[in-house]
């Protein structure tokens, strides 16, 4: 991985260009051709550094319920249990962790019609957990991380719609977010189809958005307008790349738990 690869990885973790030819735009920013950008990203995906490029949506704004789950297993059962839990489509960030009686931690999201606690309890029983803790999200503070591949450091961020500015506008947005972050936003069936389509991994071809738009029965410009609308309604956090942090050179991963006054 050379400096051009690293610069590209930095760029695609920022809001990914939603333009007709995004790889051409990326190439202009780092001084290489569109095809070279595609070739480099293809290789980064082959070596498992680049996981995918897609829209990232806020599950809570879509009516999903989320929780952090901690489970305790006998050491010899841990790997098998983790593999079984990974089969659930609502599971993410599943890690074996040290420093606690609970040695497997993951996040779980379920659709509105499903019971969150019942789902976690079923998974616990099915995998033979000794004990479980379910910790539903009560308040949202910060989410997301960017890996600075050039300076080799990570930075967390809070998503913010592109339309939100600073000063009074930002203060108003902060207040609105604090009051409504966990409230579902109505979406139409057509919008649900678009959300599913935009979550698919972006093809590494010169005009990748055209095929998504065609599948949804709209023009590419209409797709871009819909993505902007999703961001303004805070349904979509961002459109960007997700990296495998260990393959990217970031070896450490820790979760910190504090008990603080309300």
Describe each PLM feature range.
Residues 1-262:
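A compositional/biophysical signature of low hydrophobicity enriched in polar/charged and small residues
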């Amino acid at each position: 991985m050379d400096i051009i690869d690293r610069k590209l990885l930095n760029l695609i973790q920022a809001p990914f260009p939603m333009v007709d030819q995004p790889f051409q735009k990326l190439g202009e920013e780092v001084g290489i051709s569109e095809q070279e950008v595609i070739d480099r990203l293809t290789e980064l995906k082959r070596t498992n550094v680049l996981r995918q490029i897609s829209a990232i949506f806020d599950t809570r704004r879509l009516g999903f319920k989320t929780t952090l789950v901690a489970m305790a297993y006998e050491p010899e059962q841990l790997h098998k249990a983790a593999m079984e839990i990974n089969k659930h489509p609502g599971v993410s960030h599943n890690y074996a962790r040290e420093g606690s009686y609970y040695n497997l931690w993951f996040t779980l999201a379920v659709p509105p019609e499903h019971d969150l606690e019942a789902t976690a309890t079923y998974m616990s029983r099915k995998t033979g957990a000794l004990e479980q803790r379910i910790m539903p999200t009560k308040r949202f503070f910060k989410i997301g991380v960017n890996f600075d591949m050039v300076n080799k450091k990570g930075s967390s961020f809070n998503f913010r719609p592109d339309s939100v500015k600073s000063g009074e506008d930002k203060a108003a947005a902060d207040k609105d977010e604090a009051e409504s972050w966990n409230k579902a936003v109505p979406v139409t069936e057509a919008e649900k189809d678009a959300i599913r389509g935009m979550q698919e991994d972006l093809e590494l071809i010169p005009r990748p958005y055209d095929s998504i738009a065609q599948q949804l029965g709209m023009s590419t410009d209409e797709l871009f307008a819909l993505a902007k609308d999703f961001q303004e309604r805070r349904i979509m956090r961002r459109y960007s790349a997700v990296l495998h942090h260990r393959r990217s050179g970031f070896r450490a991963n820790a979760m910190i738990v504090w008990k603080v006054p309300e």
